[in-house]
């Protein structure tokens, strides 16, 4: 079959520059062996995150020029609200500056409404900031991911699913009154950008509602999840992405969204409620205090204009096929070279199994982070660790939590890089593989108490 190229023309370019090996080592040492602390100008191909790093369309840039910067009642908010109601069916819409802004104003209110004395949040897998906001609210985050996701070589289609048996047992053991919310993360980032099946979402929603537990959808990559449902579930093969999205969101009571992913914008988030006017109003109070007035939530009007357009563009099936195909292509290149990855590839990134590639480095020396550093030194490619460093310590004991995965995430920004860039990344990682046994683990030089992977400084063991 003829290969289909990117479904867009490029109207603007940004120069990037290569660096020497000596320059990269100096930059990494200055950054405390933490790719997060590298200067962007020292990075050749940046696969740190897909959050806010994508390219906007000409229509979005046109929307930027039509920004209404009224403090209250901006017409851009009205358009965003109309778009959310149409696409997701949620009546009460609150913009936030990004996803974590939505979490910080919602989670404390869910805790306040929890009838039990020991509230917990249960998810297929909380991402780092989600877990942090649960802990900042004084509560515990419990991950109940399907065990099928733990075998990175198994070609299971729905590695983002909940373990339904454990979910049932956990609710019964802890008591439904102690569950502040069940959070369905779509797609499941920490498991490898893996999708959650519609059947699993339906079962989780039914179980939660039977116990009167709120269902929150962490919707950062909702469109990619919908694409996988269409591609992998025969029952939805003839459904449109829009129809699948609407059915997914029918299963939640509220959603938080970092719109910097599938919203195709550089900044923005959403905190939305299907009904729940009383909860919505309580969260509004926090929004005013922490994010900004309820019709802008920390965003400029022009950013809301771009988001209203981006939500629709992000659901375009042709775009999604290209997007997920680009991820799959990089995964195929690596797998063909014998580099272990989470299979099948997910929606936004290729996840390299550092535990298998670097078996000589124990979890407490952060093998995936060590691999990220080695990849940067090889070719100026910046990736990020999803493993023990990100997971952190048990807040009760202070001991390092045991990570299910030690993964290097190669996160592909939307509409930014071409296949040639992917080939370069693959070539660099293949070169790293040839000297994998020489890579050393890392230990802390400075360890922050929370979300340590962002600002920690490390050194080779």
Curated annotation (Swiss-Prot):
Pfam family membership, one: Beta_elim_lyase
| Protein family membership | Belongs to the beta-eliminating lyase family.
Instruction: Name the keywords, alphabetized.
Output: Lyase, Pyridoxal phosphate, Tryptophan catabolism
Signal peptide position in this chain? none
Residues that bear N6-(pyridoxal phosphate)lysine:
261
Q: Which InterPro entries match?
A: ArAA_b-elim_lyase/Thr_aldolase, Beta-eliminating_lyase, PyrdxlP-dep_Trfase, PyrdxlP-dep_Trfase_major, PyrdxlP-dep_Trfase_small, TNase
Subunit structure comment from the entry: Homotetramer.
The answer on whether this UniProt entry bears the keyword Ligase reads no
Known cofactor(s):
pyridoxal 5'-phosphate
Q: What class of enzyme is it?
A: lyase
Q: What is this protein called?
A: Tryptophanase
Tell me the pathway. Answer: Amino-acid degradation; L-tryptophan degradation via pyruvate pathway; indole and pyruvate from L-tryptophan: step 1/1
For this UniProt entry, the molecular function terms from Gene Ontology, in alphabetical order, are: tryptophanase activity
Q: Which reaction does it catalyse?
A: L-tryptophan + H2O = indole + pyruvate + NH4(+)
Lineage runs: Bacteria, Pseudomonadati, Pseudomonadota, Gammaproteobacteria, Aeromonadales
């Amino acid at each position: 079959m003829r290969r289909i190229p990117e479904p867009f023309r490029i109207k603007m370019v940004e120069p990037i520059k290569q660096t020497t090996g000596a320059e990269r080592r100096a930059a990494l040492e200055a950054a405390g062996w933490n790719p997060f602390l590298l200067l962007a100008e020292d990075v050749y191909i940046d696969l740190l995150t897909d959050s806010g790093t994508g390219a906007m369309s000409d229509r979005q840039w046109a929307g930027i020029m039509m920004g209404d910067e009224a403090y209250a009642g901006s017409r851009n908010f009205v358009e965003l609200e109309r778009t959310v109601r149409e696409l997701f069916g949620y009546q009460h819409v609150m913009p936030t500056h990004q996803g974590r802004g939505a979490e910080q104003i919602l989670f404390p209110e869910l805790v306040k409404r929890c009838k039990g004395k020991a509230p917990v949040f249960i998810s297929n897998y909380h991402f780092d900031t989600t877990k942090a906001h649960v802990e900042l609210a004084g509560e515990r985050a419990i991950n109940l991911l399907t065990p099928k996701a733990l075998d990175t070589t198994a070609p299971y289609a729905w590695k983002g699913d909940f373990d339904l048996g454990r979910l049932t047992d956990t609710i019964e053991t802890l008591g439904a009154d102690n569950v502040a919310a069940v959070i369905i993360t779509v797609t499941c980032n920490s498991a490898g950008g893996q999708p959650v099946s519609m059947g699993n979402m339906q079962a989780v929603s039914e179980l939660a509602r039977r116990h009167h537990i709120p269902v929150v959808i962490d919707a950062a990559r909702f469109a990619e999840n919908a694409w996988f449902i269409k591609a992998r579930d025969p029952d939805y093969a003839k459904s449109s992405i829009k129809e699948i999205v609407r059915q997914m969101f029918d299963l939640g009571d509220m959603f938080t969204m970092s719109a910097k992913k599938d919203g195709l914008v550089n900044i923005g988030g959403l905190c939305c409620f299907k009904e729940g006017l009383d909860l919505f109003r309580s969260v509004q109070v926090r929004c005013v205090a922490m994010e900004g007035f309820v019709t802008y939530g920390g965003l400029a009007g022009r950013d809301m204009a771009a988001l209203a357009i981006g939500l629709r563009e992000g659901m375009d099936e042709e775009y999604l096929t290209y997007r997920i195909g680009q991820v799959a292509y990089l995964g195929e290149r690596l797998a063909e070279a014998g580099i272990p990855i989470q299979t099948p590839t997910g929606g936004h990134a290729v996840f390299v199994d550092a535990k298998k590639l670097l078996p000589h480095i124990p979890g407490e020396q952060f093998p995936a982070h060590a691999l990220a550093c080695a990849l940067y030194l090889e070719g100026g490619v910046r990736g990020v660790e999803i493993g023990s460093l990100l997971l952190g310590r048990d807040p009760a004991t202070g001991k390092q939590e045991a990570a299910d995965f030690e993964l290097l995430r190669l996160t592909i920004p939307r509409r930014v890089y071409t296949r040639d860039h992917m080939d370069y990344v693959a070539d660099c990682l293949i070169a790293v593989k040839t000297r994998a046994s020489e890579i050393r683990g890392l230990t802390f030089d400075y360890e922050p108490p929370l979300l340590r992977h962002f600002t920690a400084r490390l050194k080779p063991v």
